[in-house]
Amino acid sequence: MSVQKMMPIINYLGTGRRKSAVARVRLVPGNGEVIINGLPGTNYLQFNGSYLSAVRSPLETLGLEDNYDIIVKAVGGGLTGQAEAIRLGVARALCTIDTSNRHPLKKEGFLTRDSRVKERKKYGLKKARKAPQFSKR
């Protein structure tokens, strides 16, 4: 009996957050496929071109769009938040591949976490800032 040696699977990990969405991203050497929660990226992002381009944009900036497969576990939020969380996760994973990737990604703004989140509703108001109609008399 011969023992086969397994080739180590090379994973590059990155986590992205946006609004209430969290995306755990794995970059694996491949041919440019995007798999989100077990579905092809085009299906999961409902064939929306802007979401797909947002997910791929860090790879396109570095010219690596056909070199890595993107495998994502995304939870929380909506599709926009998840797509932008995936973009941040991909950019962070690319930084773990090679530190020289950091400068062009930072210049394009892919490594900046968008800290805007929904403001909470306050009591006495209808929404976060909308007050009930004021009647003088």
From Swiss-Prot:
Record's protein name: Small ribosomal subunit protein uS9c
GO MF, one annotated term: RNA binding
Top-level taxonomic group: Eukaryota
GO CC annotation: chloroplast; cytosolic small ribosomal subunit
UniProt entry keywords in alphabetical sequence: Chloroplast, Plastid, Ribonucleoprotein, Ribosomal protein
Family per record: Belongs to the universal ribosomal protein uS9 family.
Keyword Protease: no
Gene symbol of the encoding locus: rps9
Lineage, broadest ranks: Eukaryota, Viridiplantae, Streptophyta, Mesostigmatophyceae, Mesostigmatales
A Pfam family the protein falls into: Ribosomal_S9
SUPFAM superfamilies: Ribosomal protein S5 domain 2-like
UniProt organism field: Mesostigma viride (Green alga)
Subcellular location: Plastid, Chloroplast
A biological-process GO annotation: translation
